[in-house]
């Protein structure tokens, strides 16, 4: 059950809240089903806090410490999680529509089989994150760190991956139709070959696509 004193303190002052948390590191904050719609919690220490089924529509969580926080079933539509530390967050069944994760730490997070359309992951750290079978249509991954990220069977239609770091990124059976991969770093022919692309997919300039039919292709590195 949510703690009323904790709710009042957090809503009144993030600065005082952070001081209280420093002095009470053993207490796990409980905000189960609390209405935080539109609240400004930027730079708040919310490590391991319980936000199950909480309402955070349009909340500002920029720079917040959200490591191992519990957001199962919460409403995070339109929330700003830019520069937040999100490692170990539990987001099962959370509504993330329109969220902003610019420069967020999402390393190893589980986003598999989720509807993440139109989300902004620009410059985020998604190393080893699991996005298998997720709907990532029109998602922005500009300059994101996608090393060893799992995109197996994901829908990346119209995704913007320009300048992303993709060494070891898993793309098996991912749909990259109309995706933008210009200036992507460390992308190999084998990675492209394992995915589905179309003639509107924009690959890096160091790769070349040879179409053998309407759907079949061969990818190779350009000779220098």
Language-model region placement:
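Terminal targeting and flexible regions in eukaryotic proteins, enriched
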Residues: 1-2
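Tandem repeat scaffolds
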Residues: 5-8, 15-16, 20-224
């Amino acid at each position: 059950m949510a703690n009323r004193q904790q709710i009042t303190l957090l809503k009144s002052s993030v600065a005082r809240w952070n001081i209280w948390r420093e002095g009470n590191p053993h207490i796990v904050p409980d905000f189960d089903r609390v209405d935080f719609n539109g609240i400004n919690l930027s730079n708040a220490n919310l490590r391991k806090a319980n936000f199950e089924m909480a309402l955070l529509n349009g909340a500002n969580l920029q720079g917040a410490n959200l490591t191992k926080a519990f957001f199962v079933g919460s409403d995070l539509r339109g929330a700003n999680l830019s520069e937040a530390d999100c490692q170990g967050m539990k987001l099962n069944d959370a509504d993330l529509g329109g969220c902003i994760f610019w420069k967020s730490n999402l390393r190893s997070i589980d986003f598999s089989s989720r509807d993440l359309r139109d989300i902004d992951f620009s410059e985020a750290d998604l190393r080893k994150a699991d996005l298998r079978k997720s709907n990532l249509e029109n998602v922005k991954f500009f300059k994101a760190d996608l090393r060893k990220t799992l995109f197996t069977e994901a829908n990346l239609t119209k995704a913007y991956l320009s300048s992303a770091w993709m060494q070891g990124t898993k793309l098996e059976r991912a749909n990259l139709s109309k995706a933008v991969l210009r200036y992507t770093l460390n992308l190999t022919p084998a990675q492209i070959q394992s995915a589905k692309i179309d003639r509107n997919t924009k690959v890096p300039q160091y790769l070349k696509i040879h179409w053998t039919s309407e759907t079949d292709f061969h990818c190779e590195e350009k000779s220098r």
